[in-house]
Amino acid sequence: MAFAPSVAHKPVAAAVCPVMAATEALATEGGLEARGAIFTRSEVVDFILDLAGYTEDQPLHEKRLLEPSFGGGDFLLPIIQRLLSAWRAARPNGTEVDDLGDAIRAVELHHDTFRSTYAAVVALLKREGLSANAATALADRWLSQGDFLLAPLEGQFDFVVGNPPYVRPELIPAPLLAEYRSRYQTMYDRADIYIPFIERSLTALSAGGNLGFICADRWMKNRYGGPLRSLVAERFHLKVYVDMVDTPAFHSDVIAYPAITIISREGGGATRIAHRPSIDRATLTTLAGLLSAPTLPKDAGPVRELARVTNGAEPWLLESSDQMALIRRLEGAFPLLEEAGCKVGIGVATGADKAFIGDFESLDVEPDRKLPLVTTKDIMTGEVQWRGQGVINPFAESGGLVDLGEYPRLRRYLEARRDVIAGRHCAKKAPANWYRTIDRITPALAARPKLLIPDIKGESHIVFEGGELYPSHNLYYVTSDDWDLRALQAVLLSAVSRLFVATYSTKMRGGFLRFQAQYLRRIRIPRWADVPEPLRRELAEAAIKRDVQACNRAVFRLYGLSHEERSALGGNGE
């Protein structure tokens, strides 16, 4: 979906006094639940600042940082310490107020909290050697009391960091909720207040700027997060995701599914992910280095990389703990793909494609010595559009190589390319069999209906082939004597199958998944005999239409997924 320019900056008109009254009530009376106040451990704060790039080796006094809900100063005070350290290292010539006055913009709604943290900021600055006048002047420049979602913001920011408030919509006064909905397109369905906080923070980033938040991860999968996921996919790069479930990230256990995200205002790319790190400084410092490294080392330990996590409003599959629980349940309940009557294989490797593969009609060999070949280029659209390639078949039906004396056209063809063909490693090992392809070719495979799957893809790409073409070496295929292939195609196109592959697959550079046979074989499916006839039809029809959402709905029923399990894979538990 396209996003209109933010209307966050429009002033609250005097006529909208119910909005101002509701805001003032929250600022004055709101308890912790109403304000969504949650306190973050210092080790986690430093981890997020490191991930966002707000580090003392940078000229932080020349950068701008926004903290949209500073609370008791869990983030703000360490930010100030880093800023002062970087500023002193730069050997500045100006005054503290001139050099540092624009470096921080921090907002807090609650009056008492604002006053308390304001005093803590002034005290910190004085301990750091600033005069009382300079400390007060900086605190006045940096801190403001108000509603971040309504307050004016000047300019853009290199960093936005923090822990946005977590407030359910039913706790927000109706006039204020209506005002938020009018300003923020992501305030959709039952979105919590942290959703528009993320929207406004993202749109406040300068080019190349980083947002680093810790908050609930529900928006990454569920219904109300769809518009925010679209915004991120359209304009930003989800750089880092760290699953913090079951870690003591906060001083109280108040968010069920916390996660750290680093989102940058730059073109999209791969996402680095880590799960449930130990909350100690040494571990988190090492992990931040891996997650931020220009190139991920081969032995990246707990860090993995995924391509195309963001895709419009589609849910983000990030191997979170609830998804792992789903994997484990399905593994206990259903047989492996090949135990359920399916076979996974790979297309033919020749060792010399330029010699063995060419235009089918132009391959000057006997008709039974060539087969029409399907390649990744033929299936890019999701349907087979054969481009006319063919492959030479030197194998007899009995399994050995044919006698070239019985196939003069084949012999001439191969002899004309003998240097290339005989120069292959497999030919040198067995010179008498110099003209064999690396893999044996079985013509009956071409005649079998099959599902074709490219090796490396960012998402499931499963294409039905009706039984006319032989697969090339960069295509995996699935056949079955039991399952209807269209119904099976729906299963393999679904979020369930993608989760299996994402869980077990190694990742290529850039985070692309490898849909290799060994990972496809990890997929669990019911036996065909156990699938009711109406569901069989629903699966097949969804696949024929290539309607992935319809595939998901049918597949969720096939596996008997609970509301929570469906939510883990996307949607709102439907």
Curated annotation (Swiss-Prot):
Q: Does the keyword rRNA processing apply?
A: no
EC number(s) recorded for this UniProt protein: 2.1.1.72
UniProt-listed SUPFAM superfamilies: S-adenosyl-L-methionine-dependent methyltransferases (SSF53335)
Database matches in Pfam families? Eco57I (PF07669)
Tell me which domain of life the UniProt entry assigns to the organism this sequence originates from: Bacteria
Q: Write down the top EC class of this protein.
A: transferase
Gene Ontology molecular function terms on file: DNA binding; site-specific DNA-methyltransferase (adenine-specific) activity
Catalyses: a 2'-deoxyadenosine in DNA + S-adenosyl-L-methionine = an N(6)-methyl-2'-deoxyadenosine in DNA + S-adenosyl-L-homocysteine + H(+)
Residues annotated as transmembrane: none
Keyword line: DNA-binding, Methyltransferase, Plasmid, Restriction system, S-adenosyl-L-methionine, Transferase
What's any GO biological process attached to this entry? Answer: DNA restriction-modification system
Question: Subunit arrangement?
Answer: Monomer.
- State the similarity comment: Belongs to the N(4)/N(6)-methyltransferase family.
Protein name in the entry: Type II methyltransferase M.PaeR7I
